[in-house]
Amino acid sequence: MSVALALNLACSGAEPEKAIFVVPDTTVVDPPEELPASPSTTLEFDSGEITDVSAQANDVPPEASSEATTTTEPKRLWTLLAGGDVLLDRTEPKGIDPFKGVQPHLSSADIAIVNLEMAITERGEPYDKEFVFRAPGSAALTLAGAGIDVVSLANNHTLDFGLIGLEDTIGVLDEVEILRPGAGGNNAEAYAPRVMSLDNGIRVAFVSATAVVPGGFAASSTRAGVADARGAISRVLAAVRAAASGNDVVVVSVHWGVERRTCPNESQRDLARELIDAGANLILGHHPHVLQPIETFDRTVIAYSLGNFVWHPRYGITGETGALEVFFDGARVEGYLFHPHVLDDDGGPRPVREGDRYNRIIDITEGRCEEHDPGLDVTEDKSDPASSPETG
């Protein structure tokens, strides 16, 4: 069973509740059909306390119904599904579909987004570092066929095969109509919000940036590259503010944190608050390659790290992951579900519903991360593959 977490309104001070959907501030409503009813759970919010939500939903007075005389706006419900790091360097050459275990979630979402942790190219020279990742051009078709609509390119592997590799990556993603925020032919393109318009009229803007920036990766006015959240944070925040001013929802993807650490650090938390102040409605983190907690602040959902969504086994990384499903009513974040998965032998996500790995996933995403944090020293000797934290 998936774990449902309520949106924690900052003004209420309440802890996130399990198995309940967030109720809007002024009206009691039925939760969407996808969410399990939870009549025994209590949710506190601004205007008081609601108990037995599913029962009270049928007691809404007639004047609040959707008759022609009502002034209540019709609901515009939609969902976004987010996964973590995606690497297709081994599955694509073998013709393996790593997304089949999560296909139901991808298919049901209005928007699906992941972090693309590789170049899509067969050209270019490898960057001088320990790990460089790429997949052939057919990988773009695999992503599109799986139902992925948006990929973040702001990470420390997009330029693993140089500027020509980035050019190929952008080209094939554009061909299959996948939005690709976070990189471009210059800094104006790299930082620019990419916008998707839904059938219900909602405009969703995506901004991506990375705080992990190898030398030569950052975009400039004259050079292609990625959006830099380490050396040009003011530009990232300006992009978020611009996105918020002209769109309904702003989703920010950030490559940050320390690899294999299950707890976010202060730099992540500080940047998250700055992004929220700038107008972010949803913050999706990646780079640690393991799960980190999911929190809420001012109706913004913060997933500090969504782990590896598709990734071959490497250096003791647990393979515990999941899909974050965020529910919106128009421009308003209403709640979220996290669907626990583990990676199979091919590196693809498969649902997990019980056992130690399931319990570990729940602990970490609900904030009990310290007991599962390996406490690794990132300066460890990388000559020992079993202990190397440098995986991507």
Specify the residue positions occupied by each region the protein language model found.
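Sec-dependent N-terminal signal peptides
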Residues: 1-4
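C-terminal motif of bacterial Sec signal peptides marking the signal peptidase cleavage site
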Residues: 8-10
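Bacterial signal peptide processing site
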Residues: 12-15
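Acidic, metal/ion-coordinating pockets
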Residues: 29-32, 42-52, 57-63, 67-392
